[in-house]
């Protein structure tokens, strides 16, 4: 048993240390670089000497990133929900990489709000999140694929523990389940072209995607706009308890986001990237377990976390 453990450790160590050659000559395109995971990953890859093409949503975010990095990084303003903008970004990347192609695409752009009980949300709330987290990701990928195939490169897609088990309502978990399915399907198709696809499934990390103040404010707006009949069926206590639980979840978030960006970096620079990365103890010991349990058992556990509505049976 000890020998098997040692062998497994050595095998994992070898895979982690077995890096791609000539990294300084390779281009990486990252979406969502204004802050959070994308911002830190861009800086890490610049430190490695790679050529980073960073897409930011705002001019302010782009300028700040340029100030914090070297000439090896270039920025492009990109809203992934606008197809024309995505096409422009693809042409810009094509102009930068030339015949060598694009080594890695990192689909990181995403939002978490609006989230909440599904009945409290509108179809526009769902569409807003899904358009950014899933449809935009697919649009960017499809436009970049010819360049990635040319380089025999990688696609790294940001999913979530919420892509394995739906822990709350709204478009977030719906979109992340979609990211998982899209990633699985293109991984199998692109295997024949020498392209590798990795999925990042982080747990609860402290980023701007779900800020505490924005969360409390958003929950109050959701509650206030509900019809009186719906509010009566849930009750004020349900609203207060549900909001408190979400806020506590955000307060317990892990601030060390380098756990996540290190996983993303490994997917880019390793010759043997993993199919799925699960940074965070909560993912490893809670969410993945919940995802693998029989559905009635998972339902029982998660329903005990939810408050009881006033009009419950």
From Swiss-Prot:
Superkingdom to which the source organism belongs: Eukaryota
Residues the record marks as active site: 172 (proton acceptor)
One Pfam family named in its UniProt record: adh_short
InterPro entries documented for this protein: NAD(P)-bd_dom_sf, Sc_DH/Rdtase_CS, SDR_fam
Tissue expression remark: Highly expressed in liver.
UniProt binding sites for substrate: 160
Modified residues (Phosphoserine): 185
Subcellular location as annotated: Cytoplasm
EC number(s) reported in the record: 1.1.1.-
GO-annotated molecular function: all-trans-retinol dehydrogenase (NAD+) activity
Main location: cytoplasm
Cellular compartments per GO CC: cytoplasm
Assigned keywords, A-Z: Cytoplasm, NADP, Oxidoreductase, Phosphoprotein
Residues involved in NADP(+) binding: 29-53
Reaction catalyzed: a N-[omega-(9R,10R)-epoxy-(13R)-hydroxy-(11E)-octadecenoyloxy]acyl-beta-D-glucosyl-(1<->1)-sphing-4E-enine + NAD(+) = a N-[omega-(9R,10R)-epoxy-13-oxo-(11E)-octadecenoyloxy]acyl-beta-D-glucosyl-(1<->1)-sphing-4E-enine + NADH + H(+); a N-[omega-(9R,10R)-epoxy-(13R)-hydroxy-(11E)-octadecenoyloxy]-acylsphing-4E-enine + NAD(+) = a N-[omega-(9R,10R)-epoxy-13-oxo-(11E)-octadecenoyloxy]-acylsphing-4E-enine + NADH + H(+)
Family: Belongs to the short-chain dehydrogenases/reductases (SDR) family.
Known function: Plays a crucial role in the formation of the epidermal permeability barrier. Catalyzes the NAD+-dependent dehydrogenation of the linoleate 9,10-trans-epoxy-11E-13-alcohol esterified in omega-O-acylceramides (such as in N-[omega-(9R,10R)-epoxy-(13R)-hydroxy-(11E)-octadecenoyloxy]-acylsphing-4E-enine) to the corresponding 13-ketone, the reactive moiety required for binding of epidermal ceramides to proteins. Displays weak conversion of all-trans-retinal to all-trans-retinol in the presence of NADH. Has apparently no steroid dehydrogenase activity.
PANTHER family: SHORT-CHAIN DEHYDROGENASE/REDUCTASE FAMILY 9C, SHORT-CHAIN DEHYDROGENASE_REDUCTASE FAMILY 9C MEMBER 7
The name this protein goes by in its record: Short-chain dehydrogenase/reductase family 9C member 7
Protein source organism: Mus musculus
Gene behind the chain: Sdr9c7
């Amino acid at each position: 048993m000890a020998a098997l453990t040692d062998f497994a450790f050595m095998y994992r160590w070898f895979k982690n240390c077995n890096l791609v050659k000539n990294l300084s000559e390779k281009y990486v395109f990252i979406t969502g670089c204004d802050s959070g995971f994308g911002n830190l990953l861009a800086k890490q890859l610049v430190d490695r000497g790679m050529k980073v093409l960073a897409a930011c949503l705002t001019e302010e975010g782009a300028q700040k990133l340029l100030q914090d990095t070297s000439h090896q990084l270039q920025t492009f303003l990109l809203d992934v929900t606008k197809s024309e903008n995505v096409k422009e970004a693809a042409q810009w990347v094509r102009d930068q990489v030339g015949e060598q192609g694009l080594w890695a695409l990192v689909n990181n752009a995403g939002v978490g709000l609006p989230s909440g009980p599904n009945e409290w949300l509108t179809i526009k709330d769902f569409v807003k999140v899904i358009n950014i987290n899933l449809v935009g990701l697919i649009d960017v990928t499809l436009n970049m694929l010819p360049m990635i195939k040319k380089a025999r490169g990688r696609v790294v897609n940001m999913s979530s523990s919420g892509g394995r088990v739906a822990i709350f309502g709204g478009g977030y978990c719906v979109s992340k389940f979609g990211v998982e399915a899209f990633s699985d399907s293109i991984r199998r198709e692109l295997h024949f072209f020498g392209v590798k696809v990795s999925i990042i499934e982080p747990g609860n990390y402290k980023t701007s995607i779900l800020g505490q103040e924005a969360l409390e404010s958003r929950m109050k707006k959701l509650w206030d706009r509900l019809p009186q009949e719906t509010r009566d069926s849930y009750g004020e206590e349900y609203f207060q308890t549900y909001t408190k639980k979400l806020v506590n979840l955000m307060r317990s978030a892990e601030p060390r986001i380098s756990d996540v960006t290190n996983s993303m970096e490994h997917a880019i620079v390793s010759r043997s990237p993993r199919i799925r990365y699960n940074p965070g103890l909560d993912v490893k010991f809670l969410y993945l377990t919940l995802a693998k349990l029989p559905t009635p058992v998972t339902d029982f556990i998660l329903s005990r976390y939810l408050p009881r509505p006033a009009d419950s049976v």
